[in-house]
Amino acid sequence: MSDQIHYLETGSLDPAYNLAFEEVVLRRRTQGDYLLLWQNDNTVVVGQNQNAEAEIDRAFVEAHHIRVVRRTTGGGAVYHDLGNLNYSFITDSGEVQLLALERFTRPVVEALRGLGLQSEASGRNDILV
């Protein structure tokens, strides 16, 4: 793991673009650690192995023009809108025990605090604002 973290924003609200951007960074990046930030507009993101039909209310998402996309990683279904900021950490470290999540969340929390926002790292992978 290097001391430097490369910061990237997609600049897009399109969930398909944002997930593809994340995948491209993962596969084509040079060595180093990366922090990606993005927002999706009215989207349900389902995990790689989930049954999307079982996770969503099709009539509701269609009536409210909510997009449904699938990510290439596991985990549960989540709803994204412009009220939340999404982030990914991509690192060279293959050793889970060497990967301290605090190394990635600390700069984000400090930046938010620098903007005058009360924030803190919480749980395994959340930053509360």
Predicted features along the sequence, with ranges:
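Long, well-ordered alpha-helical scaffolding segments within enzyme catalytic domains
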Residues: 97-114
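Beta-rich nucleic-acid/ligand-interaction surfaces
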Residues: 121-129
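Residues forming anionic-ligand binding surfaces in small-molecule and nucleic-acid pockets
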Residues: 72-93
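Active-site loop/lid in soluble adenylation, ligation, and acyl-transfer enzymes
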Residues: 1-55
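Short beta-strand
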Residues: 35-39, 78, 118-121
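Active-site cofactor/substrate anionic-group-binding motifs, chiefly glycine-
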Residues: 53-77
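Short, conserved charged micro-motifs
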Residues: 54-56, 95-100
